[in-house]
């Protein structure tokens, strides 16, 4: 495609939005609930998932309901080069994110997890995937007064949650999840829980593990469990919304219209060979596909 055709076809804003969408294709999520050094554990988890994103990284912690975050451009080791950046992230719960890189898209505002401060509490959000109706939803939200601080699709979910009239928070999240379309995995940090959700087709992997001290861990790939000493206990299934808190794990569905169609690129390219996705070892899948 020539430069003339590109400029004639896409406006600068549209092209920027397209670049941001491609970034979410292969990101890495990690979360932990109930560990005294949650940030450091998340650091190691993200390091194990570094292959899923090299543009930027971030960790958001929950310290007795108060959220705090550090993020930056570069590899996990570069973003947290200064030891004090981890030491200042105190708390027993955390979510982290590594972001995939595309040329011309490096922007600190797009680095996750996102942190939101509302009059009725704080929330954190991290996302892996691609929303097929992102542009139409964003236009609709902006026309109704929504203000975005990034050009990432991720922010759309939080605007939808806040605009829902459902009386319960989980009900608002379910409503928002049924509005967005595409392949996605989300981690939401509330003041008293981590919420994990997977799209109705299970396009991206998301698993839950448990540590010897009872801490619960969520990750895009099981290879991250091995690094932190967690044992796999279950995969997040298509259409599931799972709340993790001091009482344990509560599993629910935000839709009954589900069908497991995980992206084949997870086995071919995205995932690490020592990860297990949907019960299948990635290395084994690659060997079998070559026969």
Task: State the predicted function of each range.
Residues 2-238, 243-291:
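Conserved short alpha-helical segments that host acidic/polar catalytic motifs at enzyme active sites
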């Amino acid at each position: 495609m020539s430069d003339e055709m590109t400029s004639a076809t896409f406006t600068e804003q549209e092209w920027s939005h397209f670049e941001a969408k491609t970034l979410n294709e292969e990101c890495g999520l990690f979360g932990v609930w109930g560990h005294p050094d949650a940030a450091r554990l998340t650091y190691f988890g993200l390091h194990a998932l570094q292959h899923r994103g090299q543009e930027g990284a971030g960790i958001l912690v929950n310290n007795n309901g108060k959220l705090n975050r550090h993020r930056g451009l570069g590899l996990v080791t570069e973003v947290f080069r200064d030891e004090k950046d981890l030491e200042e992230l105190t708390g027993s719960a955390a979510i982290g994110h590594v972001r995939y890189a595309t040329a011309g898209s490096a922007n600190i505002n797009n680095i996750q997890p996102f942190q939101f401060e509302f009059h009725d509490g704080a929330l954190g959000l991290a996302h892996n995937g691609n929303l097929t109706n992102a542009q139409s939803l964003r236009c609709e939200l902006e026309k109704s007064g929504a203000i975005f601080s990034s050009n990432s699709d991720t922010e759309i979910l939080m605007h939808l949650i806040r605009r829902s009239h459902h009386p319960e928070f989980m009900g608002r999240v379910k409503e928002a999840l049924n509005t967005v379309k595409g392949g996605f995995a989300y981690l939401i940090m509330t003041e008293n829980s981590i919420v994990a959700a997977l799209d109705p087709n299970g396009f991206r992997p998301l698993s839950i593990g448990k540590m010897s001290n009872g801490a619960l861990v969520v990750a895009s790939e099981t290879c991250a469990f091995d690094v932190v000493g967690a044992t796999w206990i279950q995969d997040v299934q298509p259409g599931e919304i799972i709340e993790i808190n001091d009482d344990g794990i509560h599993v629910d569905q935000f839709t009954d219209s589900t069908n497991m169609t995980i992206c084949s690129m997870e086995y071919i390219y995205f995932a690490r060979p020592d990860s297990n996705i949907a019960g299948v070892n990635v290395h084994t899948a690659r060997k079998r596909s070559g026969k």
